[in-house]
Amino acid sequence: MKKWVVGLVLVLLLAGCGATEENKQGAGKKDELKKVSVVLDWTPNTNHTGLYVAQEKGYFKEEGLDVEIIMPGEAGADQLVAAGKAEFGISVQESITEARVQGVPIVSIGAIIQHNTSGFASPVEKNIKSPKDFEGKTYGGWGAPVEKAVLTSLMDTEGADIEKLDIVNMGDTDFFTAVKRDIDFAWIYYAWTGVEAEIRGEELNMVYLTDYSEKLDYYTPVLSTSEKMIEKDPETVKAFMAAVSKGYEFAIGHPADAAKILIKAEPDLDPELVKKSQEWLAPRYKDDAAKWGEQKKEVWENYMDWMLDKGLLEEEIDVEKAFTNEFLPK
């Protein structure tokens, strides 16, 4: 969590004070589109499709907004949103929880995917079918404390010993390269890396987090903003979410067309991967929720309790301040 605070301090130092000149100008005339920005959490992928659909199909303009989609840089979306350098961002429940413990008031305003689709993936020849099979293997991660906590939690359900698992940092190494060379398994999001494996004809075994603990069925990713933005300009937040909701509803109902929109916006993406990933995600964006983006208090409480139990949080947060469904279309 110290890293989170350091990142925010750097952004604040760079940012200075006050609104950007663009936003000052954008608020000048009623008939002008209001300029706002949304920062991605990663390079563009199908988690982000609803944003690109809303942009391409004019949903943002219909709501009076001129939205710039920004790639994440050295400072991530959370830090930029917290510092007021971006109005919106893409985050995850874990990061927002950690930020609020540090007194940084960012808020989740919509769940992009209703359930956690991540898990531990391995080539079938590694014969890793359950957490018990992690013993004697090598896990490749990125060095975050949450990784060992999740691995331990899953292994405990089957009486396995975390000390018999070798955990290494694989950095930016590609999953498919790493599992052939350095590691036995890694933590992936099936909608992208899992679907890519299908296209490559490389069969995987998946150990999904949600198969072993309902407390690990947290929201990832989510759309975020700041408490300050909600307080000073709730109408813009409402307009943004109205357009984004239409974008994701379109992606749910028309995955092939939504994939074309993402490919047009980001031509460097693999068209086959985008198309198949979009098909896989379409029914999972909303899943069993009453509407896209909806969040539940118990999901926030469950994951906070799990993080506290594993020593990943210093104190509880008020989960009802960490998320809101207020800005979703009625």
Placement of each model-derived feature along the sequence:
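Short, low-complexity disordered leader/linker segments with a strong preference
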Residues: 1-35, 62, 328-330
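Pocket-lining segment of extracytoplasmic ligand-binding domains
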Residues: 94-95, 174-177, 181-266
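Short polybasic/polar patches that bind polyanions
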Residues: 13, 55-56, 61, 100, ...
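Short, glycine-/small- and polar/acidic-enriched structural segments
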Residues: 25-171, 176, 180, 184-188
